[in-house]
């Protein structure tokens, strides 16, 4: 199956360097079995800090899962070196923020939640624990004396 990139697109207001924080950041995904096409009905999360051994000593992955329909064992790995911030210059354009090594599991949907951080463009003010579940986030930058926000968060998956 190979590598699949998650691309983010958003409208940033006086904000830059939007990024997931820490190895415990939860990437909430819905997965599709590459063998039979079964799509999970529940959100599942994968984290950098999780490592599960693959059968037969073939390494490890962020998640290993047996398909409920065809019983095939599939896996997905977060490629830590590919995690990139979404910056002010990326505003309203799709940008790859992470890549996944997919072995039988294909992500088909993404639900951003809590755990993002960003900074004020002019002031550098740090904003932590940004929750994007509602696809919008607003706050006020005291240093710059201006409102800040992240709006219209959308995503797409592309094969690398």
Curated annotation (Swiss-Prot):
Disulphide bridges, residue numbers: none
Q: Which parts of the chain span the membrane according to its record?
A: none
Q: Which residues bind Zn(2+)?
A: 33, 36, 67, 70
* One Pfam family of this chain: CXXC_Zn-b_euk
Record keywords, A-Z: Metal-binding, Phosphoprotein, Zinc
Recall the GO molecular function terms of this protein's record. zinc ion binding
In the record, which positions carry Phosphoserine?
75
Cite the InterPro entries for this sequence.
CXXC_Zn-binding_euk
**Outcome after substituting residue 36 to A:** Disrupts protein folding and solubility
Oligomer and partners: Monomer.
Membership in a protein family: Belongs to the UPF0587 family.
Q: Domain text from the record?
A: The N-terminal and the C-terminal half of the protein have a very similar 3D-structure, suggesting they arose from duplication. Requires a bound zinc ion for normal folding and solubility.
Official protein name in the record: CXXC motif containing zinc binding protein
Q: Which gene encodes it?
A: CZIB
């Amino acid at each position: 199956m190979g590598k699949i990139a998650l691309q983010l697109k958003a409208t940033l207001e006086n904000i830059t360097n939007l990024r997931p924080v820490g190895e415990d950041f939860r990437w909430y995904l819905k997965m599709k079995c590459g063998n039979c096409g079964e799509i999970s009905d529940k959100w599942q999360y994968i984290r950098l800090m999780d490592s599960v051994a693959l059968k037969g000593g073939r390494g490890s992955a962020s998640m290993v899962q047996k398909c409920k329909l065809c019983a095939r064992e599939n896996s997905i790995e977060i490629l830590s070196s590919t995690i990139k911030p979404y910056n002010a210059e990326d505003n309203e354009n799709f940008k790859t923020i992470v890549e996944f090594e997919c072995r039988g599991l294909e992500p088909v949907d993404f639900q951003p939640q809590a755990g993002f951080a960003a900074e004020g463009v002019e002031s550098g003010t740090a904003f932590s624990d940004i929750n994007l579940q509602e696809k919008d986030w607003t706050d006020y930058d005291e240093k710059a004396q201006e409102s800040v926000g992240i709006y219209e968060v959308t995503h797409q998956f592309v094969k690398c």
